[in-house]
């Protein structure tokens, strides 16, 4: 039985996100990408919305790149609880790499590499890496248009937590574009071996079918790995991250401080924290509620700033006129965001600009108080 929705055209998606402001269709010129800006409790409860984390369509609206669907940590959702899992079902356990997801995007000249957001600086670093490695291009071009090969880019230039000693682009999955089906691990190894493409390693489960014991073993691992992914043969996936990895993201032990809670939310690390709060449901519920309120406030703020930008840009498309004739006449508190958006030339950058601004201004209580107006004066 298929567990993923069939997707061929952007119109297969749009009705499911029409009334969901957390999802955005970004026009990138020769392609469009559908992504989520924030994640609410029910954002991914719909199988179609669960696909909206980097779907890419060409100018005609045809699906051309389908990366991973949204999946969760063990214990993060009711349907990923330990009681709901059965390791006697066919599955493979894979090392969870600590890098950036990379996938190809077909184009007129062949393909570009992209992250969840499309062609980005991180993706261009991966493009430089494969420029003198024709085996990657040959492999990708063989699969292009029907399949999406999914890689992880690990590099000290792009270090998250785990320190990899060399740059590498490692194949983690191959997905059928239209159906969303994930090709089996053994088949991936065989086809990747033909082109000498590195493939993510499997992890031995010495606890057999005892999922609780296995999860605890993974969480007790050291600091040189992020964790594992349990991938069932039907495509269902779950993450288990090591406790050390999560703690190094400053999650569990620091939620007493507002600045740390804000950092967890802004760095999209909440999903790492929640499974470790199972023993403290009141803390878990409180931080989920706060994150939802915070993300809604940021969404509303970005909507306001984007509207201001679009109004001014329509009248004054030249940078100097925009600054002198428009920005000087709006509330000065919006000026830093409007100037940065002008550099990008569109309102799609607003969320990233606001997020980076807040990250730089939450390391002390006084700084948090100075930017609190941005998120509707919420307090942890």
Predicted regions mapped to residue ranges:
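Core nucleotide-handling region used for phosphoryl-transfer chemistry
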Residues: 1-380
């Amino acid at each position: 039985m298929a567990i993923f929705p069939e997707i061929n055209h952007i119109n297969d998606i749009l009705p499911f996100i029409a009334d969901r402001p957390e999802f955005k269709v970004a026009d990138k010129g020769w392609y469009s990408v559908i992504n989520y800006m924030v994640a609410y409790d029910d954002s991914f409860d719909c199988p179609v919305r669960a696909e909206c984390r980097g779907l890419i369509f060409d100018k005609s609206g045809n699906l051309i790149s389908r990366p991973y669907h949204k999946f969760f940590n063990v214990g993060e959702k009711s349907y990923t609880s330990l009681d709901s899992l059965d390791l006697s079902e066919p599955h493979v356990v894979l090392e969870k790499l600590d890098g950036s997801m990379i996938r190809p995007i077909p184009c007129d000249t062949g393909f570009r590499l992209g992250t969840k957001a499309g062609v980005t600086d991180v993706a261009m670093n991966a493009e430089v890496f494969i420029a003198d490695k024709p085996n990657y291009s040959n492999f990708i071009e063989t699969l292009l248009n029907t399949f999406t090969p999914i890689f992880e880019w690990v590099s000290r230039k792009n270090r998250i937590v785990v320190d990899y000693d060399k740059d590498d682009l490692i194949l983690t999955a191959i997905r059928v574009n239209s159906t969303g089906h994930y090709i089996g691990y053994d088949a991936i190894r065989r086809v990747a071996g033909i082109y000498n493409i590195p493939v993510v390693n499997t992890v031995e489960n010495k606890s057999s079918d005892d999922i609780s014991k296995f999860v605890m073993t993974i969480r007790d691992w050291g600091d040189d790995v992020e964790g594992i992914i349990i991938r069932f043969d039907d495509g269902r996936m779950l993450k288990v991250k090591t406790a050390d990895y999560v703690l190094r993201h400053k999650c569990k032990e620091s939620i007493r401080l507002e600045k740390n809670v804000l950092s967890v939310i802004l760095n999209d690390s909440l999903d790492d924290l929640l499974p470790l709060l199972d023993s403290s449901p009141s803390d878990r519920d409180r931080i989920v509620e706060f994150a939802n309120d915070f993300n809604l406030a940021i969404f509303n703020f970005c909507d306001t700033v984007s509207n201001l930008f679009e109004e001014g840009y329509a009248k004054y498309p030249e940078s100097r006129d925009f600054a002198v004739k428009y920005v000087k006449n709006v509330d000065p508190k919006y000026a830093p965001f409007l100037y940065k958006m002008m550099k990008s030339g569109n309102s799609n950058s607003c969320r990233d600009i606001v997020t980076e601004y807040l990250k730089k201004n939450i390391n002390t209580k006084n700084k948090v108080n100075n930017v609190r107006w941005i998120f509707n004066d919420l307090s942890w």
